[in-house]
């Protein structure tokens, strides 16, 4: 009898890659809001008027606002909310960066752990990660640069719709067109402007509220800058905690997380929280590895000891609930009225709820079998492989082609009733998402992979080991 080899189980962090892929879809969905509004408004262009229009004059927007409670249902809210997804991205980055450190510290005696050994083990990853993120962020601005200079992209599209004055609570991300740079007279001036924006990627210690923080050719890169800044803070904290016991580390980190949230920081507390989750997950990971090595237990039947999956499912549900907290008028959301009454936004801002939810999701998802299988599925893994590329390329494509695509789809299907509206929406969404995936696949193959190889080679050539 021929025995087929047993399939290799997914790695202990494969679900993290799948989760990143799912989060990339959520970010894509979040940036569709103004696209849908302008695409719908194109179907009945407004008459020229000297006074600015209210965004609520658009029937689709007015209908959505009148039915706002439907869009605040937990889980449904997560499907199109960028803030919780960004928070979870930051927590994941801190988790992945710290997991290697936690494994190293658990296997290395304190007496033999020296700063030199730590820098030798982790210096390469810090160098490669920082350089790789910078190079890819700069490369992602090339296509928007061409679109702006050739005149294909028009940053005044919102003004041409008459929406020149937007109330802060009613912007629906329509102001993001203004974040792009103006078209310069010559190619040389435009190239110099691009160079200045590339330099912004490196200046990670500028305050996020400053105009110079976000590179204008790809405004989503503000998260990359925040990620780089938090990763440097995390690396310093790793070194500072070398001689600290595990329990004391967790206490110090918890204090850092609380203080960071209290002063309004976003990325650093989430990175430190990711480290805490890595510290908590590591013992269970070691038990699982020992079980897999045991001859008495086949690999595919390995059981996971640890907290009750039902309890973790409850924690996951609570995390999703907190992450779904509305940023606009939470008092009008039926399922959040009690929470908002007990803890007003003045005490705990919406983004803090998103951070707490992200931490709970990262902590619990690993031990919820159904959620983990979804993240380890082939589709999620494919999206995870291309998640960074999707994040980098989707924004300029969505705002450049999205409004016209949705207008075309609704022109074909109609938009007078819910059925025809949904058909047109589905067609436009599918075409746009496939286009973004194709662009991301090309970016991953022809930009991301070569950049990774270039960074690896540069590190090998620059390493002190070459001088020995």
Swiss-Prot record:
Q: Which Pfam families match?
A: Acyl_transf_3
Location relative to the cell? Membrane
What are the EC numbers? 2.3.1.-
UniProt keyword list: Acyltransferase, Membrane, Transferase, Transmembrane, Transmembrane helix
Segments passing through the bilayer: 21-41, 70-90, 133-153, 252-272, 308-328, 388-408, 423-443
Q: What is the purpose of this protein?
A: Acyltransferase; part of the gene cluster that mediates the biosynthesis of squalestatin S1 (SQS1, also known as zaragozic acid A), a heavily oxidized fungal polyketide that offers potent cholesterol lowering activity by targeting squalene synthase (SS). SQS1 is composed of a 2,8-dioxobicyclic[3.2.1]octane-3,4,5-tricarboxyclic acid core that is connected to two lipophilic polyketide arms.
Source organism superkingdom: Eukaryota
Q: Which family does it belong to?
A: Belongs to the acyltransferase 3 family.
Q: Which of the seven top EC classes does this enzyme belong to?
A: transferase
Q: What is this protein called?
A: Acyltransferase R4
Q: In which pathway does it act?
A: Secondary metabolite biosynthesis
Q: What induces it?
A: Expression is induced on squalestatin S1-producing YMG medium.
Species classification? Eukaryota, Fungi, Dikarya, Ascomycota, Pezizomycotina
Q: What organism does the UniProt record list as the source?
A: Phoma sp. (strain ATCC 20986 / MF5453)
Membrane topology designation? Multi-pass membrane protein
Gene Ontology CC, one term = membrane
Q: Which GO terms describe its molecular function?
A: acyltransferase activity, transferring groups other than amino-acyl groups
């Amino acid at each position: 009898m021929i025995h087929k080899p047993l399939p290799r189980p997914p790695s202990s962090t494969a679900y993290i890659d799948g989760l990143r892929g799912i989060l990339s879809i959520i970010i894509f969905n979040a940036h569709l809001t103004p696209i849908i509004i302008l695409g719908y408004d194109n179907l009945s262009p407004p008459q020229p008027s000297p006074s600015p229009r209210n965004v609520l004059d658009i029937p689709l927007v007015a209908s959505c606002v009148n039915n706002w409670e439907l869009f605040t249902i937990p889980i449904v809210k997560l499907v199109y909310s960028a803030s919780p997804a960004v928070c979870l991205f930051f927590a994941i980055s801190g988790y992945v960066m710290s997991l290697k450190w936690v494994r190293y510290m658990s296997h290395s005696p304190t007496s033999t752990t020296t700063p030199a050994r730590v820098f030798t083990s982790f210096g390469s990853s810090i160098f490669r990660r920082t350089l790789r993120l910078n190079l890819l962020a700069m490369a992602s601005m090339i296509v928007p640069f061409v679109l702006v200079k050739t005149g294909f992209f028009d940053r005044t599209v919102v003004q041409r719709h008459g929406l020149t004055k937007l109330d802060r609570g009613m912007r629906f991300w329509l102001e993001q067109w203004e974040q792009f740079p103006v078209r310069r007279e010559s190619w040389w001036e435009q190239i110099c402007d691009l160079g200045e924006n590339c330099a912004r990627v490196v200046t990670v210690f500028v305050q996020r509220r400053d105009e110079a923080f976000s590179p204008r050719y790809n405004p989503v890169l503000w998260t990359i800058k925040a990620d780089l800044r938090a990763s440097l803070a995390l690396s310093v904290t790793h070194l500072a905690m070398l001689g600290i016991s595990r329990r004391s580390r967790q206490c110090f980190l918890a204090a850092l997380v609380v203080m960071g949230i209290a002063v309004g920081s976003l990325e650093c507390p989430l990175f430190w929280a990711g480290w805490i989750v890595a510290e908590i997950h590591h013992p269970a990971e070691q038990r699982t590895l020992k079980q897999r090595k045991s001859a008495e237990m086949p690999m595919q039947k390995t059981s996971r000891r640890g907290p009750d999956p039902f309890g973790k499912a409850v924690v996951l549900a609570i995390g999703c609930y907190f992450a779904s907290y509305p940023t606009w008028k939470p008092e009008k959301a039926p399922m959040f009225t009690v929470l908002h009454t007990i803890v007003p936004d003045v005490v705990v801002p919406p983004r803090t709820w998103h951070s707490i939810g992200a931490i709970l999701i990262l902590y619990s998802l690993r031990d919820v079998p159904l959620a983990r299988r979804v993240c380890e599925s082939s589709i999620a893994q494919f999206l995870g492989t291309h998640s960074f590329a999707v994040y980098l390329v989707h924004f300029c494509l969505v705002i450049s082609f999205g409004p016209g695509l949705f207008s075309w789809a609704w022109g074909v299907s109609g938009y007078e009733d819910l059925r025809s509206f949904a058909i047109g929406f589905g067609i436009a969404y599918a075409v746009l998402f496939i286009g973004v995936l194709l662009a991301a696949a090309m970016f991953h193959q022809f930009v991301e992979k070569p950049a990774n190889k270039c960074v690896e080679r540069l590190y090998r050539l620059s390493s002190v080991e070459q001088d020995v």
